Amino acid sequence: MASKEINFSDSARNKLYEGIKQLSDAVKVTMGPKGRNVLIQKSYGAPTITKDGVSVAKEIELADPIANMGAQLVKEVASKTADAAGDGTTTATVLAYSIYKEGLRNITAGANPIEVKRGMDKASAAIIEELKKSSKKIGGKSDIAQVATISANSDENIGALIAEAMEKVGKDGVITVEEAKGINDELSVVEGMQFDRGYLSAYFVTNTDKMTAQLENAYVLLTDKKISNMKEILPLLEATMQSGKPLLIIAEDIEGEALTTLVVNKLRGVLNVSAVKAPGFGDRRKAMLQDIAILTGGQVISEELGKTLEAATLADLGSAARIVIDKDNTTIVDGKGKTKDVKDRIAQIKTEIENTTSDYDREKLQERLAKLSGGVAVIKVGAASEVEMKEKKDRVDDALSATKAAVDEGIVIGGGSALIRASQKVKLKLEGDEAIGYDIIKRAIKAPLAQIATNAGYDAGVVVNEVEKNSKDGFGFNATTGEYVDMFKEGIIDPLKVTRVALQNAVSVSSLLLTTEATINEIKEDKPAPAMPDMGGMGGMGGMM
């Protein structure tokens, strides 16, 4: 077992401080509308240029093991804030550093760390309550565009694209970000439900120019069975043929005789049919088949439910106004299911999202929710170079997450002013070292505004003092113009969720670090260089001299 080094009290906390300071110094330069970029060397490929706080934090590993422990814990603040709110990582990092710095000064002077932590927790909880009271519900498309624009580093084009995407697919819709082939940004919206399964045979294609199979006013057969015997589906095929409507078969698989017969009858013009595999795997496949059944007003033919293909009738089939299938995807537009059934299914999925503890399951449930409730929007980001593309894509991802957070919980004034305004309204009566914890938070809360002002080239002390002097709710500092304005009117806003989560995470980690009394780390042992191999046996070369 490797030897361990142990550090205690002030020695441990001071070394942790060094790591937290280094990480904060690297991250804070990106803050605000006039924040700078950070250039990051990669182990392979070109360096990355980014203004994304969490991307900077993730790259930091320090040589000193104790300083590195401090940096890694604050890195966790940034990551958790990004996971929960999608933005606010730089704010969380700056707050964590400021809280730890203020707290360390007081604890070194003799304050009790546990009492200080208790006061800090009470102060942050009270400030968050004031933030909630001052928040406003997000309005229409223009509010959404403003939130997205600010988070995308004042890029109005990105803000407009995100606002348009949200308008088209709704707040529960899925918006994905991809790289465009050219230099222009684009938005495309997939209407209806789309899943990633294409036709089982190219012979099902009806539009050879686009290589798609298009079915108008079609029936949909859904089963979790593998179909290989034609006799199983013959009664249904005859019934659909007599109805004169096209048919889409969605099954676990269709193979052998069954697939061959479908293709032959399609080519002869006897049947207008297409077939695809069911989306997903295992239990998720069953759930998605049920989603499609509800959307189209059909039934899933499953032996688990006591239903067989031979006994199925037209009444068991779903239907849709239009179905488009290419080699990779199937899109069902205007399913004929009952609106109430679809709404009930959406409510059920939302409940499952709230109850799940798995990020992967939550992501898959949200995809299902989007497919049922409004479709999928794809923002394609264009740029002149790969480096610019990565940086821009990061900004779009941030802006998208911030916008969703704003829709969830509402908005507060931006630019770091909301924290100061909420702090001014909190009047806690605490005693002893708890009061010190309260004062630490009240002082540290000014750090985001101070950093935004510094990055924009203004005197941080003057700016913070000016904002504190004016008690109007919307009053704040516009770092882009250097003016003091009504932030709501100017559209300088932040999602409440981003500000709230940043403060909660910063206080949580900083207060734990302040109550740390000892650190334990491995001592790196310098391994001696390997010995040179024995050169015996080369003596015969002496004659070459």
Curated annotation (Swiss-Prot):
Q: Which family does it belong to?
A: Belongs to the chaperonin (HSP60) family.
Q: What class of enzyme is it?
A: isomerase
Matches recorded under PROSITE patterns: CHAPERONINS_CPN60 (PS00296)
Predominant location: cytoplasm
**SUPFAM superfamilies attached here?**
GroEL apical domain-like (SSF52029), GroEL equatorial domain-like (SSF48592), GroEL-intermediate domain like (SSF54849)
Recall the GO molecular function terms of this protein's record.
ATP binding; ATP-dependent protein folding chaperone; isomerase activity; unfolded protein binding
From the Swiss-Prot or TrEMBL record, give the protein name: Chaperonin GroEL
Role noted for this protein: Together with its co-chaperonin GroES, plays an essential role in assisting protein folding. The GroEL-GroES system forms a nano-cage that allows encapsulation of the non-native substrate proteins and provides a physical environment optimized to promote and accelerate protein folding.
Keywords of the record, alphabetical order, are: ATP-binding, Chaperone, Cytoplasm, Isomerase, Nucleotide-binding
What this protein catalyses is: ATP + H2O + a folded polypeptide = ADP + phosphate + an unfolded polypeptide
Assembly and oligomerization: Forms a cylinder of 14 subunits composed of two heptameric rings stacked back-to-back. Interacts with the co-chaperonin GroES.
One Pfam match, by short name? Cpn60_TCP1
What sections of the sequence does the record tag as coiled-coil? Answer: none
Q: Which GO terms describe its biological process?
A: protein refolding
Which HAMAP family does the UniProt record give?
CH60
InterPro entries of this UniProt entry?
Chaperonin_Cpn60_CS, Cpn60/GroEL, Cpn60/GroEL/TCP-1, GroEL-like_apical_dom_sf, GROEL-like_equatorial_sf, TCP-1-like_intermed_sf
**Nucleotide-binding: present as a keyword of the record?**
yes
Positions annotated to bind ATP: T30, M31, G32, P33, K51, D87, G88, T89, T90, T91, G415, D494
